[in-house]
């Protein structure tokens, strides 16, 4: 009843939100009007139950007014934030206006669509305005910037080449153990790289040595001495032969005994040298040398002849 009285007053008398067009149609400037037309159904003042969509600081909200909150003007409108996703926002409108009239559901969706399109257009215009600042660059300035970029790239390549050459010189030791004008951190970095390279080279050399040892021929000393004639046995045999030959001639026996003693000493010295050589160098091939004299062979032949 009160809504009808308010509409009669607005329609028949004066309303500050109403605008009359030259063609006779009336429009409403109220920010809560869902259609923008001055009609009984779309007037926010003449309807105690009303719903609309409004934009606030770039965000869209669904506003709802009910008679239960008419006595509290500070809490008259209930505001619900709508999702940025278009389909989800439409679902929110349907959920909150489920028991409302079809007119408000349809007009709220229509207003939400229009406001979404307006926001998209505003963003496009803002982007175009920002792009215009970059379009108005003079060709001379553009060429100058391109030349600077090209020169900067060339300078960067030269600097890298110089840095590489200096690093190679530092590693090779061209500047001594530690140059005076080199930062300590850089020097430690270079020394660390050199140590890593040396360790890698040592590992590679060790691997190569292990690989080269495969199939290598080595000569080692034999533990069994059964094949060689014992020196003591040889001395006994020579002593026996000397005793038998002494009965033939005393002069020959004296000379033979002296020569035998000399040969015995030489054989002992050679045997000691051979033993020392084998103990000191076990991994080298062993060579044994035997010394023989002609008069020993002659004595042996004489004994055989007798």
From Swiss-Prot:
Residues 194-233, 251-265 have a biased composition (Acidic residues). Residues 270-284 have a biased composition (Basic residues). It is found in: Nucleus. Its main location: nucleus. InterPro entries: Mak16, Ribosomal_eL28/Mak16. One of its GO terms (cellular component) is nucleolus. The keyword Manganese does not apply. Keywords: Cell cycle, Nucleus, Repeat. Residues 251-264 are annotated as: 7 X 2 AA repeats of S-[DE]. Residues 234-245 have a biased composition (Basic and acidic residues). Residues 213-229 are annotated as: 2 X 8 AA repeats. Gene3D superfamilies: 3.30.390.110. One of its GO terms (biological process) is maturation of LSU-rRNA from tricistronic rRNA transcript (SSU-rRNA, 5.8S rRNA, LSU-rRNA). Sequence repeats lie at residues 213-220, 222-229. A motif (Nuclear localization signal) lies at residues 139-144, 282-287. Residues 194-306 are annotated as: Disordered. PANTHER family: MAINTENANCE OF KILLER 16 MAK16 PROTEIN-RELATED, PROTEIN MAK16 HOMOLOG. Its role might be as part of the apparatus concerned with the nuclear events of the cell cycle. Belongs to the MAK16 family. This is Protein MAK16. It comes from Saccharomyces cerevisiae (strain ATCC 204508 / S288c).
